[in-house]
Amino acid sequence: MLRPPARHGYASCVHRIFTTSFASVYPLYVAKAERKGRTKDEVDELVLWLTSFERSDLERHLADATTFEQFFAEAPLNPNASLITGVVCGVKVQEVEDPLMQKIRYLDKIIDELAKGKAMEKIQRTP
């Protein structure tokens, strides 16, 4: 059976990442940062900045293996998240149609920026 082609906005289907546990991807974010000389603490700082979670919230989500969908449903997203722009996986994050996929791409983008050596102050956007 053939699948319909994926669209840039992902609005037409439930993407597999939505049901993937945040805890299963989190170590990949940390590993990516550490390979480039950055730290787990910096990854945590960015996750906390984006989600407006407390550290205890992050630890709970990791322990409970909540899905990305649940993770972002509970996250009071940082009001400056919409200032995150750029391309992840060939898609401009500011043009992603599905709100959940856009939040996931925001996270991917700021972790990419961290791994590329961008200063924390620049990654954590301010108007």
Language model feature labels by segment:
Residues 9-127:
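A charge-rich, low-complexity, intrinsically flexible signal that marks solvent-exposed coils, linkers
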